[in-house]
């Protein structure tokens, strides 16, 4: 694979929601639907100067030299996926719902493949979302915020603990007028500070006073 970007890059991870169940229910329709899915993702990635580095059967891993190219890819793919559907033998409409996650950072490129924690975080960000949803990390949001077109915005989803990662991540949802905006709660654990009112932080910076008060209470017993 030639001309893969190095240094600071952006990864896009995608996954078809409930793909195992769909294969059980619609084995024939899924063959055609998956072919459309693969074509849509490939065209979206390549049209935005990206590279597909791995296919997973129900998703792709792609890399971009800029975060904006990655976000443009996700938006373009979601729009096309919403228009693509298969009709089953019982006249049910089958539309694939794809969750997407993006993260920006450094990764080691070796023998045509990437390694490092940046990929792990991108995968966990993707897994926190739902079909049709595009989530990005805080660093990706910082990089693209001033460069987004007027019809694209970022919705602050708060800070979340992601499975297997020590450091919590502030997540943002990419919002576009013609894409779904409302989704269930993320598949993650919000950090405790998300739910604490600000007045509960009044003792921050007053450790000495608290220690002395504790000593006085102890001596009075």
Residue positions per predicted region:
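Catalytic NTP-binding/metal-coordinating core of nucleotidyl cyclase/transferase enzymes
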Residues: 1-75, 79-83, 87-88
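Intrinsically disordered, glycine/charged-rich C-terminal tails and inter-domain linkers
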Residues: 1, 131-132, 139-215, 220
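Short loop/turn elements that form and flank the Walker-type P-loop nucleotide-binding site
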Residues: 5-7, 95-97, 219-220
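Conserved phosphate-binding and hydrolysis motifs of nucleotide-dependent enzymes
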Residues: 57-58, 105, 206
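Catalytic beta-strand-to-alpha-helix segment of the class III nucleotidyl cyclase homology domain
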Residues: 39, 61-176
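Short, structured helix-loop boundary elements
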Residues: 31, 67, 95, 207-210
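Short glycine-enriched loop/turn motifs at secondary-structure junctions
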Residues: 4-5, 54-57, 126-129, 194-198
């Amino acid at each position: 694979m030639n001309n893969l970007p190095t240094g600071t890059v952006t990864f896009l991870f995608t996954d078809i929601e409930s793909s195992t169940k769909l294969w059980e229910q619609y084995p024939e329709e899924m063959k055609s639907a998956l072919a459309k899915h693969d074509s849509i993702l490939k065209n979206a990635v390549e049209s935005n100067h990206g590279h597909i580095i791995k296919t997973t059967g129900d998703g792709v891993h792609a890399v971009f030299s800029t975060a904006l190219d990655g976000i443009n890819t996700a938006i373009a793919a979601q729009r096309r996926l919403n228009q693509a559907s298969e009709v089953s033998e019982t006249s049910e409409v089958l539309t694939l719902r794809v969750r997407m996650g993006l993260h920006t950072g450094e990764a080691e490129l070796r023998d045509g493949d990437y390694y490092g924690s940046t990929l792990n975080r991108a995968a966990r960000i993707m897994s926190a979302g739902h079909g049709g949803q595009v989530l990005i990390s805080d660093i990706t949001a910082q990089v693209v915020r001033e460069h987004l077109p007027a019809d694209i915005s970022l919705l602050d989803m708060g800070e979340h603990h992601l499975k297997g990662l020590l450091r919590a991540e502030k997540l943002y949802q990419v919002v576009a007028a013609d894409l779904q905006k409302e989704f269930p709660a993320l598949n993650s654990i919000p950090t405790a500070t998300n739910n604490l009112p600000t007045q509960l932080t009044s003792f921050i910076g007053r450790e000495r006073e608290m220690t002395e008060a504790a000593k006085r209470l102890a001596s009075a017993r």
